[in-house]
């Protein structure tokens, strides 16, 4: 399948594989979906894109491993508190694929107590730094927490209003900034 699509054998050299992946990300900046997304979200073409290269963390190496996704607040209601799910002995795609039923993020405290304490601290730090609700992906490998990604989380209109007001009450945003956070679309 790879050869039919690309016209060459899959490279066996890891450096060549990595460079191919990096080039694919940069090429994706010009695909039609990316162009539509930039236009719809007022993102200038000149910003370009970036590639992060990081060591792989494995959540599927036993019962002391796992992976999950979480928000620092409920994206449906805006309620302040961790909201998300995780799976033990799994990789990231397993959480979203629906192959297994994930556990609520609160159950992580029993499965990985030390990693959970650290996770809560990291969540608090990220939200304070970005001054907005965060949507995060993480892996636990043999009890050690690895944060893979964070971004400002998408939310319902109801949640957007509550989060904006709460961030003002918590001293993280001014009233003017909170109003500007609300997407009128």
Feature locations, PLM:
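Terminal amphipathic helices with adjacent charged low-complexity linkers/tails
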Residues: 1, 86-88, 132-185
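Extended, highly charged
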Residues: 1-77, 89, 99-118, 175
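Short loop/turn segments at secondary-structure transitions that flank enzyme active sites
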Residues: 59, 92, 153
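Short acidic, glycine/serine/threonine-rich loops at helix termini
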Residues: 63-66, 94-100, 146-151, 158-161
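Short acidic-glycine loop/turn motifs at beta-strand connectors
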Residues: 74-79, 90-91, 140-144
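Secondary-structure transition/capping motifs at alpha-helix termini
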Residues: 75-79, 128-129, 170-174
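Phosphate-binding core of ATP-grasp and ATP-grasp-like enzymes
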Residues: 80-93, 122-134
């Amino acid at each position: 399948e790879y050869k039919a699509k690309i016209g060459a054998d899959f490279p066996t050299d890891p450096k060549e594989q990595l460079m191919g992946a990096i080039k694919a990300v940069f090429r994706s900046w010009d695909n039609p979906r990316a162009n539509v997304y930039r236009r719809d979200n007022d993102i200038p073409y000149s910003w370009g894109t970036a590639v992060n290269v990081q060591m792989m963390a494995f959540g599927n190496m036993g019962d002391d491993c796992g992976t999950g996704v979480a928000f620092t607040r409920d994206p449906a209601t805006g309620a302040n508190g961790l909201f998300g799910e995780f799976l033990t002995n799994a990789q990231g795609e397993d959480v979203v694929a629906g192959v297994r039923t994930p556990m609520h993020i609160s159950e992580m405290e029993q499965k990985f107590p030390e990693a959970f304490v650290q996770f809560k601290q990291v969540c608090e730090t990220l939200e304070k730094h970005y001054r907005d609700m965060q949507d995060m992906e993480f892996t636990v490998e043999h009890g050690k927490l690895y944060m893979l990604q964070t971004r400002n989380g998408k939310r319902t209109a109801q949640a957007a209003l509550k989060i904006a007001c709460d961030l003002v009450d918590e001293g993280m945003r001014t009233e003017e900034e909170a109003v500007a956070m609300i997407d009128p679309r």
